Curated annotation (Swiss-Prot):
Name under which the protein is recorded: Cardiolipin synthase 1
Keywords attached to this entry: Cell membrane, Lipid biosynthesis, Lipid metabolism, Membrane, Phospholipid biosynthesis, Phospholipid metabolism, Repeat, Transferase, Transmembrane, Transmembrane helix
Transmembrane parts of this sequence: 13-33, 45-65
Record organism: Staphylococcus aureus (strain COL)
Gene, per the UniProt record: cls1
GO-annotated molecular function: cardiolipin synthase activity
Function: Catalyzes the reversible phosphatidyl group transfer from one phosphatidylglycerol molecule to another to form cardiolipin (CL) (diphosphatidylglycerol) and glycerol.
A GO cellular component entry from the record: plasma membrane
Record localization: Cell membrane
Catalytic activity: 2 a 1,2-diacyl-sn-glycero-3-phospho-(1'-sn-glycerol) = a cardiolipin + glycerol
Pfam families the UniProt entry points to: PLDc_2, PLDc_N
PROSITE patterns: PLD
Topology with respect to the bilayer: Multi-pass membrane protein
Similarity comment text for this entry: Belongs to the phospholipase D family. Cardiolipin synthase subfamily.
Source species taxonomy: Bacteria, Bacillati, Bacillota, Bacilli, Bacillales
Amino acid sequence: MRFTFSNDLGTLFTIILAIGFIINLVLAFIIIFLERNRRTASSTWAWLFVLFVLPLIGFILYLFFGRTVSARKLNKNNGNVLTDFDGLLKQQIESFDKGNYGTDNKQVQKHHDLVRMLLMDQDGFLTENNKVDHFIDGNDLYDQVLKDIKNAKEYIHLEYYTFALDGLGKRILHALEEKLKQGLEVKILYDDVGSKNVKMANFDHFKSLGGEVEAFFASKLPLLNFRMNNRNHRKIIVIDGQLGYVGGFNIGDEYLGLGKLGYWRDTHLRIQGDAVDALQLRFILDWNSQAHRPQFEYDVKYFPKKNGPLGNSPIQIAASGPASDWHQIEYGYTKMIMSAKKSVYLQSPYFIPDNSYINAIKIAAKSGVDVHLMIPCKPDHPLVYWATFSNASDLLSSGVKIYTYENGFIHSKMCLIDDEIVSVGTANMDFRSFELNFEVNAFVYDENLAKDLRVAYEHDITKSKQLTKESYANRPLSVKFKESLAKLVSPIL
């Protein structure tokens, strides 16, 4: 009896392995042939490695983290929202191709090729009537956000990766509910994974007052989200079509420095002016993509005439996501780095880009450009941290100055060149932000803002340690092992 049981068990195990092997062969075929235009070579090899080293587990991981997104499904509900902006983009492209840049701004004229490239995206139209303020502290940011919510007159739209309903989240939700009582339109779009501790039931009172709330790529089954790999990492607020926010801060007490990582250093922009139209457009397209309610159509109230001359900061909003082969933000960063003549200042909590991005940084440094990169000194995601540390260290031999921020956790996503142009937003300098997640950045052609953020960066350096070739060479063997493991799977982190 025992012998029969053993044989049966062995047969069952063999069948399971055979099924797993067949499934992996099918997935390998899909990854190599059917998804070849949606993946980099390094990503393809990394997934093949996972599938064949971990046959059954690899299949499960692929279901959650390996599937790609259909652009057709995402864009099917756009309606007539894009009509006016398609015309504006076409007009600006034609003007730039003729050498007519439509502005006296020196930075736009000097970097017209960057502007022209960013015009290739539906959000990328150039606006000039803008006033920009920046925030590097979460308390200062959300004090201002709450004031702006209180002063809203017609509507408030929020789109966030993380909307934690802790102290800060409850304060913001209460402020929004007060505006609902005054008859305003209020919509919240949060990411289902980034806000994993939030339930739709938490918004029952908000919805009873007339508020609308949706979860991006919401899971249809408890604890099972097969779109876990493609998250909406954007952070956008639009108020009355006049005022917008974009940057790295999520909503939650952690971002006020009250979490386990300590002080939270990030960068966020408050924009008044015509660039708010691009943030509004992005919110509407993302809202419509979820298709669970009546869709937005074009309405002049969402794109109103702005309240007079506000400033002279030219801005382009760049969005990127897995449904497009054109990685707008990555290419924008890369173009900036390759255009730099004097200096490049980079900040990113995760630094796992592809070789072309790393080579652009090396080329800039070896061309005599003063290149700085700042990363965290502590991990919030261990494997990601060690891949970041390894990639950053690879730049040392090219003359790049590497800093680890010691005063808490740095979450800022910033690229700044020559004290002339700065990009701030949600996109980390990694494969996930460049290709897998939905991201949004502002590219600002404003010397004053660029210089202010460079001064803030230099202050950050005083709270950082500079990584040297010597200190990196003397790292412990355990660190070398972690780096090697992390780098092996970094294309799918």
